[in-house]
Amino acid sequence: LCLDEFHQASPEEVDQSIYTLSNGVSKIRSNQDGSLASRKRWKLLFLSTGEIGLSEMLEKVQRSPKAGQSIRFLEIPVIGKYNAFDDIHGYASGKEFADAINDKIKNNHGSLIQPWVEHLSNIDDLPTYLITNIKELTNRWQFNSKGNQFGYALDRFALLAIAGEMATKIGLLPWDCGDSEKAIFNIVESWIAARGYESDSEDQFLLKQLPKALNKWRNK
């Protein structure tokens, strides 16, 4: 799910929506007769296509992202050789390349969904297949962190890499084997560099507050 024009939403709505989208279940509501309505459920990956991140959004109302929010809505810097791109495939500029992509999308979209779903449906025990491959890939990436939040994010990155590799192998993407994994790994490294640490946010908060606490109590 791509969230466009993210900056036009109110910070208060964004604050709550991050949990709503990621938790995958609607609020408990009642029918007109007072009985409980059935709860809607979903499972999705979502991203913002806007230029503003969650931290900047919440700063408008003097708030900071909670640990749960920051790990559900990852802030990934997009800085390429040509703005958002590293390769503009022969076009004169990043803007010209982006405009060409937008033009192609208008006439070519949805054509891969049927063969993709057919492929997934032919995999025996898809959940086990994904769990096994996600674990193998994250182990191969060899990050040292044991933090639960970092591991949660890494699993989501690995899922995207695996999906890309699967699509490449069955001819749905014109990439070479390993391209998807390499691209996602580069994104992981950018995310870690921008985040500044691999541990859980609460641990980092305590480390930042420790010098302040020591100075405070030393002067008592």
Write out the residue ranges for each language-model feature.
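Short loop/turn elements that form and flank the Walker-type P-loop nucleotide-binding site
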Residues: 40-43
